[in-house]
Amino acid sequence: MGKIKVTKVKSAINRTKNQKLVLESLGLKKIGQTVEHDDTPNILGMVNKVKHLVSVEETK
C-alpha cells in the first residue's frame, strides 16, 4: 500500500461545513501544511471531496 502527501493550498473560508470537517479529519489546518496518509479508499474519498482545496502527490 502506498502513501500520499496532501497539501492544503486554498482557504476553507466560505466552504461548507462538511468540507471543513474533511480538512480537519485529514489533519490540515493552515495553508501550505502537508500531511502524509496511507493510500486507502477512505482517505482517497476524503481527498476527492476537497480536491479543489488541496494538492496530492504520491510517495513511496
From Swiss-Prot:
GO molecular function: structural constituent of ribosome
Bilayer-crossing regions: none
Pfam families reported for this sequence: Ribosomal_L30
KW Ribosomal protein (keyword) present: yes
Keyword Ribosomal protein listed: yes
Entries under PROSITE patterns matching the protein: RIBOSOMAL_L30
Positions of disulphide bridges: none
Listed InterPro entries: Ribo_uL30_ferredoxin-like_sf, Ribosomal_uL30_bac-type, Ribosomal_uL30_CS, Ribosomal_uL30_ferredoxin-like
Coiled coil (UniProt feature): none
Record keywords, A-Z: Ribonucleoprotein, Ribosomal protein
Gene3D superfamilies on file: Ribosomal protein L30, ferredoxin-like fold domain
GO terms under biological process: translation
Superkingdom assignment: Bacteria
Signal peptide: none
GO cellular component, one term: cytosolic large ribosomal subunit
Family classification: Belongs to the universal ribosomal protein uL30 family.
Oligomeric form and interacting partners: Part of the 50S ribosomal subunit.
NCBIfam families named among the record's database cross-references: rpmD_bact
Protein name in UniProt: Large ribosomal subunit protein uL30
Organism from which the protein derives: Christiangramia forsetii (strain DSM 17595 / CGMCC 1.15422 / KT0803) (Gramella forsetii)
